[in-house]
Structures are given as C-alpha cells and as structure tokens.
Regions:
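Structural motif
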Residues: 33, 100, 382-383
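Signature of N6-adenine DNA methyltransferases within the class I
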Residues: 5-21, 38-56, 61-70, 80, ...
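Non-catalytic DNA-recognition/assembly elements of restriction-modification systems
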Residues: 240-283, 346, 463-508
C-alpha cells in the first residue's frame, strides 16, 4: 500500500504555505507562540521565518523527527524552539496555549489507523462533546488544535473539502461556529494535492474578531493574489452544505422554500445498493475471460460503472451488447455452493488465480463462508441511479435487464407510482440543482450522492402516458447536452404542473 496513505503525509507546497502566511500577516503582530502540530518538512515554519513574523516561541510536533534538524537550523537564535517527536494525538504540554496554530494535518482513513490512534481520536472528540466515530484522523487533529488556542488565538489549516459538505462533518461545522468569532474559508478551482485526489480548502478561525461572521472566497490558483472574502452567514444555518457558499441568501431561501412544497424521491420509490463483489477487478470479467476459463455457467450480466453509460435515460439491450463487444467488464461471477461442487479444471484455474492474488484474505472476502461466493446477489432492478457522476446525475430505466454494482442504487417504485413518469419527472432543473446542493464533490469535479442524500432530493412528480415518455426519450437521444433535455421538461413540470410564476421559473 502507498506509504502516504498509511501516514497521511502529504507535504504542503511552499507556495501554498506562503499564500496562507501572507494572508495572515496583518493579523500576526501580537503573535507570541506558534505550534505546527504535524510539521513534516516545515513549510509553514520556513515561510513564517521568511516573512519575518514576530514570534517568541515555536513548537513543532511530528511522529518523524528526521526534519527537526533542518528546521532548527533556519530559526533565529532569539526564538525559542521546542521539538516533540510524538503523535500529535498524544501531545500534552501542561496545558500550554498558543497564539497561532498552523499546519496541514495528516489524512488517514479510519481503516488504516492503528488501534491506539483510533482510541486517541475517540478520546479527543468525546472530550469536545462530539460523536466519537471519527472517519479520518484529520478531524481529531483539527479539534485538538482548537483546544490549544489561547483566548485571542488563530487556527490556520489546510483541510479536506469534506469539512464543507459531508454528513459526518456537519457536527464539526456546528462546533466551529461556537468556537470562533470569525471564520474564513478559501476554496480552489484546482486540486492542490494531485496524489491525494481530494479537493482541499484553507480554514482560518479567529477566536476574537472585530468583524464577526463566516466568510468565503474561491480562487483559481495560488498565483492569484486578489482574495475577496464574501460573508455568507445564511448558508451556515441553512440545510445546505457550505460548499455552495457562492449562492446568495436570496437564491438559497428561494430553493429552500420550493423544496418544502415538493415530495421527495424517497416518497415515490425504494432504493437499495447494488452488488458488493469485494473485488470488481476479479469478480467482474469481460467476455474474453469468460470464454478462456469456461465461466459461462457462472456469470450474470452486470453494469459496473456509470462511465459505461452514454447520455441516455434507458439502458438498452443494444447498449449492453456494445459493452460486451468492446471487451469491457460486463459479467459478474455468481458462484454458489451448489454450482461449485463439481467444477472443471478451467474454472478451478480461475479460482486459483484469485487465491494467488490473496483475495481470500481481503477484508470482505475473508468474512465470507467461501471467499469467492458473493452474498446478496438479489434481483435485477427496474431502474438504477449512479451515485457518482461528472456532468449530471444519471437515472435510467433498465431495459437491458442487467445487475448493477454498489456504484448504483436500485430503484423499485412504490405502489401507485409509475416508473416512466418518475424518470421523466426527475429530469428537471430544480431536481438537478438540488442534487448539486445536497451531494458532495471529489477531486476532478466528481459529484456523489449517498443514499440519504438521493432519497431526500425533491422531485415534482407528474403522471404521464407512454406517448409523452416516448417523445421525451426521442428528444433526449438527440439532445446535445443536459440543458436541452431539461428545457422542454421544465416548461411542463415546473411551469404548468408546479405553477411557478415567470419570475420564479427564471430564477430556477
């Protein structure tokens, strides 16, 4: 496994550290003591010294002390420096508080943490009155740093954009509103850490400030020295995620009011995740592999990824046949205890390959009675929704009768509602906009909706006949983009059915 994933060590580029320090410089005249809790190669300390920030004492903490000597060599003699070779989660220095805490905490998912680290995270979060189930180590670093600020302290950290948008960070967002008088959040158009694959933000919190509130700014790149901070206190107390700070209060209030009048996706259908294979690269195969190992008896048709679907609203038999012809993974192995009692040598060869690749000891496979038997194959869905998308969310009728992986949610209509009407009603601007507002973004502009977010999307359901749906389908096939698909639907769904005024319609 990549060592960076284990240690969370994604060192801060000097230009990013300098950008933050330059922005903070006017607020650092009275800085007495500075702490960098995960110092790494010392990018922040280097830029603080280079910018002549007045400071009496610097403390640096890191689990790896190999950089300490280099950092110490650049710090002027008149500044006291304390070094601590330990995990910051265990750091304890007799309740010493700091004027500035600055850094880039490690990013390590819970499943890669050691038990001692998990226990430390729980203790830190519990002590702060928060839920103890930390999803990632950065949350504990963040909360502990807040607790070490003095009454006028400033916290400046490079954090994952998760803080603004994911469900588990909602509690953190409420927490920081109570801890800081002023908050500044700076977002970027581009990834700052390509290897991380995670959108990044700059968080700055001021314990005391003459200009209170929550301020946001988005910049294209670090060379852009023009930083305009805009206050948006409404979003911090609305049901929307902070990642949509660029929308003004009037727009957010308008959307919130509309959403309250409309039923949700969860009112019309049941949703379940698709098949969890535990190792798609092994259990989902193409036709060539199926032929080579004589696996025809053991496979079922499957659509693995949303990327394999064109911009369509029906996944047709022809589309699936094309997927097979292109050599894409399109068959899932469905072994059972019965059908593997007398397997031939070809099939056994394929199972041996899986054993040699150590899938048997994988986290999910190891929990199975027989490692290669996938549980809960379940049923073929009538329709499916891909939880991740690029240009727009995709909800499709499953004409091809294929299974789906857990990259999609299976759709089953509740009694009294029609699937074609549901698909038609989904493709309107309000529902698509809300998917952007309710979901979360990952590196490269990927939008994801977790099950709870998908189920609470508002959908102005209208019952239509098959003739109207066929017209919609034909129009969608010819459309150059999602905007063309939505335009015609909006007139009928939002104007005629939802009875929006011309002004409201244009605002949507």
């Amino acid at each position: 496994m990549n060592s960076k994933k284990k240690t969370g060590s994604y060192y801060t580029p000097l230009d990013l550290a300098d950008f933050i320090v330059q922005h903070l410089k006017p607020s650092l005249n009275d800085t007495n003591s500075i702490l960098e809790p995960s110092v790494g190669d010392g990018a922040f300390i280097k830029t603080i010294i280079a910018n002549n920030i007045p400071v009496n004492q610097i403390s640096i903490v890191d689990i790896n002390d190999e950089h300490f000597k280099n950092i110490q060599s650049i710090i002027p003699q008149e500044i006291n420096i304390n070094t601590y070779k330990e995990d910051f989660l265990e750091y304890n220095n007799e309740n010493k508080l700091f004027s500035l805490i600055i850094g880039n905490p490690p990013y390590i998912k819970k499943n890669l943490l050691q038990k001692a680290q998990i226990d430390s995270c729980k203790s830190i979060l519990t002590a702060a009155g928060l839920k103890s189930s930390a999803k990632n180590i950065w949350t504990a670093f963040f909360i502990k740093s807040i607790s070490l600020l003095d009454k006028n302290g400033i916290l400046a950290m490079v954090l994952p954009a998760e803080l603004l948008q994911v469900s588990f960070a909602e509690e953190l967002r409420h927490y920081i509103l109570n801890k800081f008088q002023r908050i500044e959040i700076i977002t970027f158009d581009n990834l700052l850490f390509e290897c991380k694959g995670q959108n990044t933000i700059i968080f700055i919190g001021y314990k005391e400030s003459k200009n209170n509130g929550v301020y946001f700014s988005n910049i294209e790149n670090l060379s852009d020295k023009k930083l305009t901070l805009n206050q948006n206190n409404y979003i911090t107390h609305s049901p929307f995620k902070w990642s949509h700070h660029y929308l003004d209060t009037e727009d957010l209030q308008f959307i919130e009011l509309l959403c309250k009048k409309i039923k949700l996706i969860g009112d019309y259908c049941e949703t379940k995740p698709g098949i969890v294979s535990a190792a798609n690269s092994y259990f989902i195969i193409n036709e060539e592999t199926e032929n080579k190992f004589h696996l025809h008896k053991y496979t079922l048709p499957i659509l693995q990824r949303g990327l394999f679907v064109n911009d369509d609203i029906i996944y047709t038999k022809e589309a699936y046949a094309k997927l097979i012809k292109e050599g894409k993974p399109s068959k899932i192995l469905c072994f059972t205890e019965d059908n593997t009692k007398n397997i031939n040598s070809h099939v056994q060869s394929y199972l041996n390959i899986g054993s040699q690749m150590d899938f048997v000891n994988g986290w999910k496979c190891s929990k199975r009675k027989i490692w290669y038997i996938i549980p809960n194959i379940s049923t073929i869905p009538d329709a499916f929704f891909f939880k991740r998308c690029h240009q727009y969310p995709k909800l499709l009728i499953n004409e091809a009768q294929v299974y789906v992986t857990d990259s999609a949610y299976k759709i089953c209509m509740k009694t009294g509602f029609d699937l074609s009407s549901f698909i038609y009603s989904f493709y309107n601007t309000l529902t698509i906009v809300c998917s952007e507002l309710f979901g979360r973004y990952y590196g490269g502009g990927v939008l994801e909706l977790i099950p709870s977010e998908f189920k609470r999307l508002p959908i102005p359901y209208v019952a239509i006949n098959e003739k109207i749906f066929q017209q919609f389908y034909n129009r969608a096939k010819k459309a150059a983009n999602i905007t063309e698909i939505l335009q015609e639907n909006d007139n009928y769904i939002l104007k005629d059915n939802l009875k929006l005024t011309e002004e409201q319609f244009n605002q949507v």
